């Protein structure tokens, strides 16, 4: 990888340095950055670093990150799940449908909302039933995004 300073900063002992490095790397378009972001998303002990890695991966829209993002939508911290879902929506394939549908029942409404958006982008008719159930969600934003997703599916 020719981004040696980025590698060094991504592994810095200071969490704040790693956290800011992730966001900075989102602004660079070199392919060599995506593996650095994926590694941090998968392995960093700080949820804030993992969240920022997901945010940066959304900016890259690189399908090679989909495996890592798919794992991260099961992260213990809701913000990591939310932003990983948002990034995954940019590189979606139907193989992630079941994982995304499960997130329509997440404890956090932001995660449920992102799942509805992702299902709309995915465009699979298999999402219709779960999206219809989300029309009764307690959170209005989830209901709105579920309705929009259904409209994208011509329902």
Listing of model-derived features with the role each one plays in the protein:
Residues 13-14, 45-46, 76-77, 107-108, ...:
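Short inter-helical turns and helix N-cap capping residues of alpha-solenoid HEAT/ARM repeat scaffolds
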Residues 24, 56, 87-90, 118-121, ...:
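Core register positions within helices of long alpha-helical scaffolds
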Residues 47, 55, 67, 71, ...:
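Alpha-helical adaptor scaffolds
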